[in-house]
Regions:
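N-terminal glycine-rich anion-binding loops that anchor highly charged ligand groups
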Residues: 26-40
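Zn2+-dependent cytidine deaminase-like catalytic core
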Residues: 36-135, 252, 262, 320
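Alpha-helix capping at helix-to-loop junctions
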Residues: 122-126, 145, 149, 198
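Enzymes that bind and transform nitrogen-containing heteroaromatic metabolites
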Residues: 2-13, 18-23, 27-30, 45, ...
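Short alpha-helix boundary/capping motifs
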Residues: 64, 121, 147-149, 327, ...
Length: 380
């Protein structure tokens, strides 16, 4: 493998910045960025906008008017080698006689996974791998998990007081956190493929659970290709079929999957389209709640890559107790609600300190008067 230089890192960072634009629209594909460099100058830039659209390499080649002979291509993910909705990028780079390809991450997709690099090397093109690999893998962490297993990446968001409460005793919760935190939540929603919530949240808050793009900070909004804006699938866990779908706002726009629990094997997995917005499905129970593993595998079959959980204590606790939570976004305000407030969590007791579930603090950031604590599960 060629020596990784500061120059390689500099140009790969530019490719990663481009890739971040695709996090909002590239579903179910990974977010990929590419820059093409000749004589130390960038001559082409591109990122993958949406499934079925040209890949990042092709966008950058177009930007360079396909005049790239002898150039170096920096791309955040291994160039594809198979015919899907678009032709293989590796073959196009070979055809146009680029001199060198620098990649951040290998593609774990079995359809690619090393085959793109082989095409390039067999053509005499120099290949350098794993430049800023850690950053690239984290950027596409949802894709990396979901493409190699049956379960999507799960992000759990909690807004809470300084003393770990999500609401007053009477359920009042608007607003524990400030407007800047809520803007950031819109950004997380916009990067998610579905949002899961529970029946109690729907009844208490009557939320829309939609991405309010007009509330995104300009630095986020300007990245998005407005042509491909989308709304995540909304998944509501209504174990006992208690919700009246004509009463709540969440059922009046976008796509909603309403999940009911059942012990009847004949009902299990059956779906019914209720109207243009709502589909009902029956899923098995585990400990009197919807079986989360069954639910997540079902969503994985829909090619859902990233799940966001925005719910109350019961569902939030269930995701953490189950071990399916890959990351936690804890938005903590300076408010103190007191001992009678509703707890953010009601977790199982650890058997011992050396056997307890543990999350690693990835990042902290201040949003107005609030602080975001971003934790990753121990396996990430």
């Amino acid at each position: 493998m060629s020596q990784v230089s500061d120059t390689d890192k500099k140009f790969m960072m530019q490719a990663l910045k481009l890739a971040s634009c695709g996090l909002y629209t590239s579903y179910p594909n990974p977010a990929v960025g590419c820059v093409i460099v000749r004589d130390g100058k960038i001559i082409g830039r591109g990122y993958h906008h949406k499934a079925g659209c040209p890949h990042a390499e092709i966008m950058a080649l177009q930007d360079a008017s396909f005049d790239v002979e002898g150039a170096t291509v920096y791309v955040t993910l291994e160039p594809c080698s198979h015919y899907g909705r678009t032709p293989p990028c590796a073959l196009k780079l070979k055809e146009l006689k680029v001199k060198r390809v620098v990649a951040a991450a290998d593609d774990p997709n079995p359809k690619v996974n090393g085959k793109g690099f082989k095409i390039l090397r067999d053509a005499g093109i120099e290949v350098t791998q794993h430049v800023l690999e850690k950053e690239a893998l984290f950027q596409n962490r949802a894709f990396m998990k979901s493409i190699t297993g049956p379960i999507p990446y799960v992000s759990v968001k909690v807004g809470m007081s300084l003393d770990g409460k999500t609401a007053l005793k009477d359920g009042s919760s608007k607003w524990i956190t400030g407007s800047e935190s809520r803007q950031k939540v819109q950004d997380i929603r916009a990067k998610s493929d579905c949002i899961i919530t529970g029946v109690n949240t729907v009844i208490a808050d009557d939320p829309l659970m939609s991405v309010r793009y007009d509330e995104l900070k300009e630095k986020y909004y300007k990245k998005i290709d407005k042509e491909y804006l989308r709304q995540p699938l909304k998944v509501i866990l209504d174990t006992n079929s208690s919700l009246n779908i004509t009463k709540y706002r969440i059922f009046k726009e976008g796509k909603v999957l309403l999940v009911h629990g059942t012990t009847d094997s004949e009902l299990l997995g059956t779906e019914k389209v209720v109207n243009e917005h709502v589909t009902r499905i029956f899923m098995p129970l585990r400990h009197d709640l919807i079986d989360l593993e069954y639910l997540l595998k079902y969503l994985g079959e829909l090619k859902i890559r990233r799940v966001m959980v925005e719910a109350g204590s019961i569902l939030t606790t269930a995701f953490i107790n189950s071990g399916f939570c890959d990351e936690l976004y804890l938005f903590m305000s300076g408010k103190v609600l007191g001992k009678d407030g509703r707890n953010a969590f009601n977790l199982d007791n650890a058997l011992s300190l050396d056997k307890c579930q543990e999350f690693t603090l990835y990042k902290t950031k201040k949003y107005g008067s609030d602080v975001l604590l971003h934790y990753l599960s121990g396996g990430n």
